[in-house]
Swiss-Prot record:
Domain of life: Bacteria
InterPro entries linked to this entry: Ribosomal_uL11 (IPR000911), Ribosomal_uL11_bac-typ (IPR006519), Ribosomal_uL11_C (IPR020783), Ribosomal_uL11_C_sf (IPR036769), Ribosomal_uL11_N (IPR020784), Ribosomal_uL11_N_sf (IPR036796)
Similarity annotation: Belongs to the universal ribosomal protein uL11 family.
UniProt protein name: Large ribosomal subunit protein uL11
Role according to the record: Forms part of the ribosomal stalk which helps the ribosome interact with GTP-bound translation factors.
Assigned keywords, A-Z: Methylation, Ribonucleoprotein, Ribosomal protein, RNA-binding, rRNA-binding
Region forming the signal peptide: none
Stored HAMAP family: Ribosomal_uL11
Length: 141
């Protein structure tokens, strides 16, 4: 018989940087999950991407065991990394903070494709271009 799922927890945690402090500890503690065990497993799985924000979906079962799935980093994080910027523009239509090439957008779209709700690569690229536009990053073709 399969274990009964009692909840899902969605978090965005720096790769290799999970620790029992907020937001990880309180979110897992509410469901009764072994916080240190999760931190060890997550840090071991993501240590190669250290520092990058990684979304994670944790499935908690009735016996307090858990499984987790890591996703690709959010598109804004990848765009800022490609544009060598710390943050996006506060006024994206007026102030542009950086530029990325069409090739860099394609690379990000290929990386994000499993997590995006896009039919093909062209649709994924359009989503990434829209994200860049809303952050004040210019896409050069």
């Amino acid at each position: 018989m399969a274990k009964k799922v009692i909840g899902f927890i969605k978090l965005q945690i720096p790769a290799g940087g999970a620790n029992p402090a907020p937001p990880v500890g309180p979110a897992l503690g509410q469901k009764g999950v072994n916080i240190m065990e999760f931190c060890k497993q997550f840090n071991a799985k993501t240590q190669a991407d250290a520092g990058t924000i990684i979304p994670v979906v944790i499935t908690v079962y009735s016996d307090k065991s858990f499984t987790f799935i890591t996703k690709t980093p959010p598109a804004p994080v990848l765009l800022l990394k490609e544009a060598n910027q710390k943050k996006g523009s506060g006024e994206p239509n007026r102030n542009k903070v950086g530029t990325v090439t069409g090739e860099q957008v394609r690379k990000i779209a290929e990386l994000k494709m499993p997590d995006l709700n896009a039919v093909d690569l062209a649709g994924a690229e359009a989503m990434i271009r829209g994200t860049a536009r809303s952050m004040g990053i210019v896409v050069q073709d």
